[in-house]
Amino acid sequence: STTAPQSLLLLNSGFSLTMAKSLAGLCQAGAAPAGESVRRMYRLLFQREPSREEMRLARQFVAGPSSGDVEPLAQLALALINLNEFLFVD
């Protein structure tokens, strides 16, 4: 986002978290390795494959411990839906 209040609203809203959890569930359904869930998420959100660096960082993040009641894949989804690449069309 381009403004701090907008970014904070998107990151902290219940709607964004609900959508992130739904996206994580959709990407996890039927995906064997964690990497496939990440690839699905990128395809759905950005219509492209993740770069090697994006894939490495995402796998590292998803493999880490969860914080609170939100699983790491849902946290990743929340972060990705708040990227400018998702919010704005070039």
Positions of predicted regions on the chain:
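Surface-exposed patches in mature extracellular/periplasmic domains of secreted proteins
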Residues: 53, 69-75
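Amphipathic alpha-helical segments that form the core helices of the histone-fold
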Residues: 56-66
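Solvent-exposed, well-ordered amphipathic alpha-helical segments
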Residues: 33, 66-69
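An acidic, gly/pro-interrupted, aromatic-rich
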Residues: 1-45, 49, 75, 80-90
